[in-house]
């Protein structure tokens, strides 16, 4: 009886081992693809292991995201909001906005998406080579503060038209998550997204 049980185990073990070897070899033979481009005024790199070409789908997702949250894109939703133009934010913008507001409340304003005027005054954002002095910074603080913006009927309401949003502290990570989602929908397990 013991010999029969051993043979049965062996019959199950052989296909299991062969299957595992096949899967490992196949994965090692799958090529890595790499693409790069520009988003948010910087470079992105995406490397992924997949038999097909996902470049068009990845670039489409980046383009959609850039059209929503890039302050470096004059036609993006966030740029239009900063220019006080009428815009209905898309789901990318709303997800980042809602999460930003949660974090702002949790940190008592230490995290704040209304910092664009301060970022620009230091030459970090869309306006380069400006070094705001302390008087300029103090005056800009009057038009910052997450509590000075709200969402009503799907639109951003600003208490002061000079308020500007900058979601880059969250947007780059969220864009990476969106691209990871694109890759995972295709069954890609090995990848790296860098922005």
Predicted segments with their positions:
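A contiguous, well-ordered beta/alpha segment that forms the leading edge of an enzyme domain
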Residues: 2-168, 181-192
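Short, conserved phosphate/pyrophosphate- and ester-handling motifs at nucleotide-, phospho-/glycolipid
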Residues: 172
